[in-house]
Amino acid sequence: MQLRKTLLVGLVSVALLSGCSLFNSEEDVVTMSPLPKVENQFSPTKVWSTSVGSGVGDYYSHLRPAWQGTSVFAADRKGLVKAMDADTGKQIWQTDLSEKTNFLSSNHSAMLSGGVTASGSHVYVGSEKAVVYALNAYDGQVAWQTVVAGEALSRPVVSDGVVLIHTSNGMLQALNESDGAIKWTLNLDTPALSLRGESAPAVAFGAAIVGGDNGRVSAVMMEQGQLIWQQRISQVTGATEIDRLNDIDITPVVVDGVVYALAYNGNLTALDLRSGQILWKREIGSVNDFIVDAGRIYLVDQNDRIIALKSDGGVTLWSQSDLLHRNLTAPVMYNGYLVVGDAEGYLHWVNTDDGRFVAQQSVDSSGFLSAPVVASDKLLIQARSGTVYAFTR
């Protein structure tokens, strides 16, 4: 089993108590698959690239660009937020959210980790310091900032006048979109040991659908923060603490009244949106967001297999195993192809019909952590180094 995510501080505490073993002593050490040889059927064109601060480095900060209208917004971990022209990559504005100290010392990192989200007149980003920022989309000035219940590790989600934040300690909070005031807080319960990351909510018909570290999917009324239903899709099993992790750190997908959810050590599950009743499930685990499109589900599992399944019943259509343990990003659909990045900075383009590679390109040696983003006719991706790239096909 490949441990894909940094664990919470609680993991270290558990390991120290009573000499507790986190890993099975017989567990194999995984090795990254060699780069597969691909005969490119086309060559994606790099339109522009631009640096955004120092990126995320070796930290597990899931920052990725956001696109709205003619602008692209991106951030680095230290606190630099930048707006760029979507066609050229030229800077429109930049804002530094790092904490100012005296003139002899460098600024303290803002530790940005959740975002970036662009919606309406604001750009939103959250931090490990439990602060959510709203910046004016047109000039980058801070419109408001709010201290939330815990680390904001997932991207803010904006809908129906509220900004939804899922914090690292299992709190789902709704902030007023205009001024950041907290409207309600709901405790979704977090076990002592969990993966470092949280599911960003999906929104449908006035409800927020969110996965929790307790292996449950919850539906919450956005207006009042009232729980509608809760369904467990991942059970605590296994001999080691790692095997018993059952987080749902992936954003659910809602299509035609069905909620699709995916857990780390659990199942790919389809649930009825109205009742939460389980319609079907498959034993597949992941830490990456997935796609539901045209009757198919596309995902990257915890061992970096790329898998296509039928959305009605979960039957496997194909599986691509040539990128095992290359620490793939979540997939995106772009111009009819699946695209994933990997830890060595390659982009892999995959045929959706059979899972075969159609193109491969080396982009940035610092590697990719966060998924690509589709921005109209362009594909955007941000490397660990902070550089944002725009490609066309």
From Swiss-Prot:
Transmembrane segments: none annotated. Its main location: membrane. One of its GO terms (biological process) is Gram-negative-bacterium-type cell outer membrane assembly. A lipid is attached at C20 (N-palmitoyl cysteine). It holds the Pfam family PQQ_2. It is a lipid-anchor. One of its GO terms (cellular component) is cell outer membrane. A lipid is attached at C20 (S-diacylglycerol cysteine). Residues 1-19 form the signal peptide. Keywords: Cell outer membrane, Lipoprotein, Membrane, Palmitate, Signal. It comes from the Bacteria. It is found in: Cell outer membrane. Part of the outer membrane protein assembly complex, which is involved in assembly and insertion of beta-barrel proteins into the outer membrane. Belongs to the BamB family. Part of the Bam complex, which is composed of the outer membrane protein BamA, and four lipoproteins BamB, BamC, BamD and BamE. PANTHER family: CELL SURFACE PROTEIN (PTHR34512), OUTER MEMBRANE PROTEIN ASSEMBLY FACTOR BAMB (PTHR34512:SF30). NCBIfam families: assembly_YfgL, PRK11138.1. This is Outer membrane protein assembly factor BamB.
